């Protein structure tokens, strides 16, 4: 019986070390390098991830800013060897000035200033403070950081590096869009109500367009 308890304690210790290692973030928050640009003037926090800027306003905690940066980095460097796994994707992101804005809330000063003044092509998604979950999500929770970072990387990176496979344009006939149309039971530019019986993928976010 004692041996079983020792074994259990050992397993729990190993698990705690692994969990702690997965949550370790090695990024430092820097001052906003583009504070003189009207579009970025309300951001006070910045992290450089392989040349891609993570910009956050003051109301977003340092922990959450670092979490967004860590997830972005892991999408690009999954084995965490500090080398981007796909240089073509990174080059497409950099050529478009890809970035990830992190706003405290919808309609915040930073969001208003950003979208009133930004005229680039580097934004495909944004993060909001209330959507970011830095701990292990519960059953009814989802860390939107994962999805929003992937939107940016897929839309600006993969879709341009490999258009025949990953283009998100509705008439591109890419492998991605053909697979999605098959899963949804047809080609729909708006959400069908209801989905056809043969559909096995039912996406119902009315804030999204076909590409989303």
Each language-model region and where it sits:
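Acidic/His-rich structured neighborhood in mature extracellular/periplasmic domains
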Residues: 42, 49-198
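Catalytic-loop region of hydrolases
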Residues: 28-39, 62
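Sec-dependent N-terminal signal peptides
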Residues: 5-15
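Extracellular low-complexity, Gly/Ser/Thr-rich intrinsically disordered linkers
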Residues: 199-212
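A eukaryotic "domain-start" boundary segment
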Residues: 23-26, 30-32, 45
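N-terminal secretory signal peptides that target proteins for export/translocation
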Residues: 1-3
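Boundary at the C-terminal end of the N-terminal hydrophobic targeting segment
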Residues: 19-21
């Amino acid at each position: 019986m004692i041996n079983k308890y020792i074994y259990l304690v050992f397993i729990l210790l190993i698990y705690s070390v692994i969990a702690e290692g997965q949550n370790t973030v090695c990024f430092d928050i820097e001052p906003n390098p583009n504070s003189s640009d009207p579009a970025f003037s309300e951001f006070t926090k910045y992290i450089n991830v392989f040349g891609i800027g993570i910009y956050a306003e003051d109301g977003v905690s340092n922990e959450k800013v670092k979490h967004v940066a860590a997830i972005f980095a892991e999408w690009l460097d999954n084995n965490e060897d500090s080398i981007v796994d796909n240089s073509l994707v990174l080059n497409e992101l950099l050529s478009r000035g890809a970035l990830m804005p992190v706003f405290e809330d919808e309609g915040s000063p930073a969001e208003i200033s950003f979208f009133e003044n930004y005229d680039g092509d580097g934004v495909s998604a944004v993060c909001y403070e209330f959507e970011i979950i830095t701990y292990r999500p519960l059953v009814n929770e989802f860390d939107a950081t994962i999805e929003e970072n992937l939107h940016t990387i897929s839309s600006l990176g993969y879709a341009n590096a490999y258009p025949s496979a990953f283009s998100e344009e509705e008439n591109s006939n890419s492998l991605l869009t053909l697979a999605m149309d098959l899963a949804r039971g047809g080609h729909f530019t708006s959400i069908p109500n209801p989905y056809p019986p043969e559909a096995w993928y039912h996406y119902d976010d009315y804030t999204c367009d076909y590409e989303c």
